[in-house]
Amino acid sequence: MLRTSGLALLALVSAVGPSQASGFTEKGLSLLGYQLCSHRVTHTVQKVEAVQTSYTSYVSCGGWIPWRRCPKMVYRTQYLVVEVPESRNVTDCCEGYEQLGLYCVLPLNQSGQFTSRPGACPAEGPEPSTSPCSLDIDCPGLEKCCPWSGGRYCMAPAPQAPERDPVGSWYNVTILVKMDFKELQQVDPRLLNHMRLLHSLVTSALQPMASTVHHLHSAPGNASTTVSRLLLGLPRPLPVADVSTLLGDIAKRVYEVISVQVQDVNECFYEELNACSGRELCANLEGSYWCVCHQEAPATSPRKLNLEWEDCPPVSDYVVLNVTSDSFQVSWRLNSTQNHTFHVRVYRGMELLRSARTQSQALAVAGLEAGVLYRVKTSYQGCGADVSTTLTIKTNAQVFEVTIKIVNHNLTEKLLNRSSVEYQDFSRQLLHEVESSFPPVVSDLYRSGKLRMQIVSLQAGSVVVRLKLTVQDPGFPMGISTLAPILQPLLASTVFQIDRQGTRVQDWDECVDSAEHDCSPAAWCINLEGSYTCQCRTTRDATPSRAGRACEGDLVSPMGGGLSAATGVTVPGLGTGTAALGLENFTLSPSPGYPQGTPAAGQAWTPEPSPRRGGSNVVGYDRNNTGKGVEQELQGNSIMEPPSWPSPTEDPTGHFLWHATRSTRETLLNPTWLRNEDSGPSGSVDLPLTSTLTALKTPACVPVSIGRIMVSNVTSTGFHLAWEADLAMDSTFQLTLTSMWSPAVVLETWNTSVTLSGLEPGVLHLVEIMAKACGKEGARAHLKVRTAARKLIGKVRIKNVRYSESFRNASSQEYRDFLELFFRMVRGSLPATMCQHMDAGGVRMEVVSVTNGSIVVEFHLLIIADVDVQEVSAAFLTAFQTVPLLEVIRGDTFIQDYDECERKEDDCVPGTSCRNTLGSFTCSCEGGAPDFPVEYSERPCEGDSPGNETWATSPERPLTTAGTKAAFVQGTSPTPQGLPQRLNLTGAVRVLCEIEKVVVAIQKRFLQQESIPESSLYLSHPSCNVSHSNGTHVLLEAGWSECGTLMQSNMTNTVVRTTLRNDLSQEGIIHHLKILSPIYCAFQNDLLTSSGFTLEWGVYTIIEDLHGAGNFVTEMQLFIGDSPIPQNYSVSASDDVRIEVGLYRQKSNLKVVLTECWATPSSNARDPITFSFINNSCPVPNTYTNVIENGNSNKAQFKLRIFSFINDSIVYLHCKLRVCMESPGATCKINCNNFRLLQNSETSATHQMSWGPLIRSEGEPPHAEAGLGAGYVVLIVVAIFVLVAGTATLLIVRYQRMNGRYNFKIQSNNFSYQVFYE
């Protein structure tokens, strides 16, 4: 939107058509814009007047005296420039507005209007936040920038005066703009121009109403767009439909605006938008709200409000569940007979992130930041008061500290000011140096957004910088040892001189500051490497799954040391040690109810008997890697003694493993994490111990037997195991996990259940469980478990890459470079939705092998996300066909199902049969349930079981989609996850825009949900009905010239329109939901095709339009004569190079029009040194360019002698083109009779890529002017000599004829006279 006015002018002319090309003022303002006024302007203009002047000239007088000269009066006409006043009407911005591009906006000095937030600054109030500001947009949420103590700080606005009538009407307005958000930030860093343009458009469209507009948020949209959200206030309520109609005019008049959506705002959710007092109930209305006292009800309220309360009990059992790195769930109880509406608010510090109301007693929050402390306040109105309670929650993360001492800088006042230019430059350079020092695995985390780095403080001496590194779900064990390699590159920095002694990597101690952890005030905070855990000091922990957060009961008397009840060993008092690089010990505190203290190295502690049986011990981090809940809860009468029980050991990642001895058990978990936990919240199945009280009489050193094994919660990264076993003294279980893709993992536990996470998706794991006691090994149980993922196998043959022996070595640089190019090219050709799945890890591509012939790449596709397998396969096949730089042989490229049954990679138990399906398999129980001691909880053995395809994905589905802001998911306590959500038409239909046809895919689940028969569906005409059908989708296709499909084209876009209908019924009566949905595909006409470097001749390029709806595929080919030019071809100055640019797939009514072609000495199409040879679709004079055809067919051709007017030895060619569709009233042919150069302001922004180059042939100096050869020089000299000789001969002959010929020879007969002859 903020591009140059000339660019937008050309775009708008293209959009409205040539007939409206005059719709602009002389200043470039669009006549379709707002706030335009006519002004009478008087100014001086220059005009030319003809004036006759006389002067005296002396000429010859004539007569006998030739030198005599006489005066003569001579008259001549002179043209003088004079300035005269002229008045005329000029269309310009109205008073109070100024021009910005094509439109009129408020000036920047009125930023208080277009950057303001609702409400007013409080006259008196609490201390503001520490965030300094200059404008309201610098503050989070709805806070305002208010003056306070000589400065300006962010503060909560003052509440409005209470009124009985609605004081205003508020709406959410979402505007989608044709501008890439990153480009917008580059040209407008603070978005001030963007805000004032949106403000002017909205307020002008609603005139004469006095509206107020507040900018809330701008973010990147899909396919190079920007989404802006505004808060619109009107003086009186209007229906949402009326406001939407008024604002919809913006999209019709402003080319850069794609759409405008309007929604009602629930003013009751935001204290800043309603004036209801604490004793009143706020009732939301469309466009407004109503404040209701206890004695009255709103007459216009859509529902009856319960205004009487009998009791006001407090909110109890307020706990947090399912805490992850970006989400959590809160639940509570209220012992009341009334139905209450709860108001839940989430704060980050003093910033209000979200406010919501719900009638349930649970709420899920997603889209949060990792490692951040949040405060959740839940309240309800009762007995005329606000009954509330507050809970503190910190999202999971691993946090580390990096301290850097820089000696070549001094700490100054400007460096302490975070708004100064010096601080910005210093922080940017420092963070860049640290980022460059990251090892590869940490660098990948940083680029993927899973590692957040921030400067915490700057201290003197010279400059000591404290960095805080927050890691979210790294996917592998993360510890200080992982970050330690950054120290050596930092010390070698060329920008900063770093002191080795003052630079270190260490753990971030959350326990030092209460603002860094969420432990209860009645709990100890115990620091761990990368995280922390909490330990209640009371007699009861209300949430054992998150220990130390909700402590109840009496406090245990604090003591300096405690006596172990079993061993009598005195242990020292509790400490909060900090794990740093090189430390191997950790701090462990006793469980609730036991003496306080921490065992020293090599010591053991013995808890009292636990009242639970068959429980699970937490012996490692969970999959969120927080270390919380590391507290141990031992079974029944188990006793922990040093000789017989293993001692805890810590691997470099901070994971605590239990082994018999360190010498014999050094196998680490590597990427696999062990989590033994209670099964309550997670839904895992733990089997009870089969022993009774008599089982305690089992001999102490006899391994127990293992009974039935239950496998549950199988996801793409882990699963849960539980097994039956007798209870015995000194008995442990050893688990061995092996797979073909990772080393074996050995772990020991005394529990009968374990949860494994951090595994690779779609991998078959062999599990062995063995009971041990006193060094003796018992019976072994074996089973197979395959992590969930659908799998495809494929092969692609690449013609223009030669096979190298180095490809046999996967670690060689050539192999890695080729894979990097392959992945980058394939990803760049995938649609945006598929790229999002790949970025989120929902779809993974793994190269299995690279073999000869030319290059054959075999790969696997792992599909974890809830996306159709055929859609993934089709997307990758299309990407292979259109991938740039790589020439793919289509006939030898395929993607097919991966047969797990044939390859024996299924986990079906003996007695069941494996049946292969597309992307997965099923286990069928023929003849009843198998008699096998392994049971899969998600596989009911009744005929054909649902199999992997059913249970592999459901546990992975999140409650909400993580975004940039917190989002609420309203619900109650955990419910069964297998119930499918109801689909709407938008979510069930996917439109695939292809050249020459439109394809619509509809989910069958939606058709079954709405009872819509497949036979009733068609596109515009009944002949274009369902063409393909599988188990999940139906497909409908319509060609561009079939079934009444409409095609419209202008200078900018080609739009194909059809309609999805389902009113086709053989009986003539429709008994189902009727669908009448318009469908359109937009293709961008303006394309840029460049010639640049490639591995082989020819390039296919996909240029998507701004909406990503469709694309045209272009091809550029170079010839000399009829022979195509290979890569890096050399041509001479006299060679005519013929260039063809056109569409890859032929369509008779689509024409290609070249608009501009130029050459550059580098592969950068935007190189400042350019040589234009086609401009405004016509050849530029004196460039030896001849246009053969342009606008006549689906390809354009021209010839040129490129090195006849360019002195460089290497050039790259670039061309812009547009796609044109001929109609009876319009032609695409170009007329170059009235040629003019296209001005810079008329260029159009297009996508770019390079290919080439062309090289001047050897023997010609790169900078020599084009000259004549030696042969031509000889011919010219001879011709000149002949011409001179002939001219001399003619002159001599003429001279003789005019003067006669004299003969002085004496005649012999008469020698007395000389005879004269003429």
Curated annotation (Swiss-Prot):
SEA domain residues: 396-510, 788-900
Family matches, as Gene3D superfamilies: Elafin-like, Immunoglobulins, Laminin, Zona pellucida, ZP-C domain, Zona pellucida, ZP-N domain
Domain (EGF-like): residue spans on this chain: 264-313, 507-552, 897-938
Disulfide-linked positions: C37-C94, C61-C70, C93-C104, C511-C525, C519-C534, C536-C551, C901-C914, C908-C923, C1157-C1215
Domain Fibronectin type-III: 314-398, 702-791
Cellular localisation: Cell membrane
Region (Disordered): 593-655, 938-957
Coarse class of the protein's main subcellular location: membrane
Tissue specificity annotation: Isoform 4 is expressed at low level in kidney, testis and fetal thymus. Isoform 3 is expressed at low level in prostate, testis and fetal thymus.
Sequence ranges on the Cytoplasmic membrane side: 1294-1318
Residues the record marks as carrying a glycan: N89, N109, N172, N322, N335, N417, N585, N713, N984, N1050
Residues spanning the membrane: 1273-1293
Keywords, in A-Z order: Calcium, Cell membrane, Cytoplasm, Disulfide bond, EGF-like domain, Glycoprotein, Membrane, Repeat, Signal, Transmembrane, Transmembrane helix
Stretch forming the signal peptide: 1-21
Residue span, ZP domain: 992-1235
SMART domains to which the protein is assigned, alphabetical: EGF_CA, FN3, WAP, ZP
GO annotation, cellular component aspect: cell surface; cytoplasm; external side of plasma membrane; extracellular space
UniProt-listed GO biological process terms: adipose tissue development; cellular response to gonadotropin-releasing hormone; regulation of gene expression; regulation of granulosa cell apoptotic process; regulation of ovarian follicle development; regulation of reproductive process; single fertilization
Start and end residues of each EMI domain: 33-106
GO molecular function: calcium ion binding; peptidase inhibitor activity
Origin superkingdom: Eukaryota
PANTHER family associated with the record: ENDOGLIN/TGF-BETA RECEPTOR TYPE III, UROMODULIN-LIKE 1
Protein name (record): Uromodulin-like 1
Organism: Homo sapiens (Human)
Lineage: Eukaryota, Metazoa, Chordata, Craniata, Vertebrata
